[in-house]
Amino acid sequence: MSDVLTRICDDKRALVQARKSARPLSAVEDDARSADPAGGFIRALRRTVDGGRYGLIAEIKKASPSKGLIRPDFDPPSLARAYRGGGATCLSVLTDEPYFQGCDDYLLSARAAVDLPVLRKDFMVDPYQIAESRALGADCILIIMAALSDAQAVEIEDAAIAWGLDVLVEVHNREELDRALALKTPLLGVNNRNLKTLAVDIATTEELAAHVPADRMLVAESGLYSPADLSRMAAVGARCFLVGESLMRQEDVSAATRALLA
């Protein structure tokens, strides 16, 4: 890790420690046990792809370190409904506050607004966050290989499995991809954004796709703006896509989502 990602993860560890002090793990686990069952994030994507359509993970994101404020009129329930109306298969909701202006309530309100499975998009550095994610109603969590050691990634994934959560493991280069393949999850995302520099190049997915085994579901992430971009990614085997900023900037999010998937 270096630069942006290191800073984010260092801050996240400090935040998690503060949350642990404010609310012990046992209390969070009680909430997680009383939450509605997880909704089958991977199952929904498989069903969509098997039906001959692209599986879109549509992201609810207010801001980012690279672009600042993305959508001033930010209402997660309305956005969730717009994405669902536009044909999204799943949602991704940013809950990181310091860098993305997210919060837990955004996930709660989006989850309550629609019946789509939801990914908690955050920087997972501690198993405490996994129980927290289940308590919030998340169906899937993110593992960023650039942010974790192999042992930490396994620990986070094992915690997710124990809580019935699916896992999207994210990589940006061949070394991270090889490490990610040691995990159990079939859902493998290639982030076209380098989280250390924030630079974007959609050729990243093209370069790594050939090394993704056939039993993994390839998800192309970041830098996708048009049906042509999705077709370019599909040509190398991606049938699932995580798209946020390009849709969040549109006045009519539902229409933009339909157009992207056309």
From Swiss-Prot:
Keywords, A to Z, come to: Amino-acid biosynthesis, Aromatic amino acid biosynthesis, Decarboxylase, Lyase, Tryptophan biosynthesis
Recorded catalytic activity of this chain's protein: 1-(2-carboxyphenylamino)-1-deoxy-D-ribulose 5-phosphate + H(+) = (1S,2R)-1-C-(indol-3-yl)glycerol 3-phosphate + CO2 + H2O
Q: Give the matching Pfam families.
A: IGPS
What's its job? Answer: Participates in the tryptophan-dependent indole-3-acetic acid production, which is a phytohormone released by A.brasilense.
Tell me the GO BP annotations in alphabetical order: L-tryptophan biosynthetic process
Q: Which family does it belong to?
A: Belongs to the TrpC family.
Q: What are this entry's molecular-function GO terms? A: indole-3-glycerol-phosphate synthase activity; phosphoribosylanthranilate isomerase activity
Entry protein name = Indole-3-glycerol phosphate synthase
**InterPro entries given in the database record:** Aldolase_TIM, Indole-3-glycerol_P_synth, Indole-3-glycerol_P_synth_dom, Indole-3-GlycerolPSynthase_CS, RibuloseP-bd_barrel
Which Enzyme Commission number(s) are listed? 4.1.1.48
Q: In which pathway does it act?
A: Amino-acid biosynthesis; L-tryptophan biosynthesis; L-tryptophan from chorismate: step 4/5
State the source organism's domain of life.
Bacteria
Q: What class of enzyme is it?
A: lyase
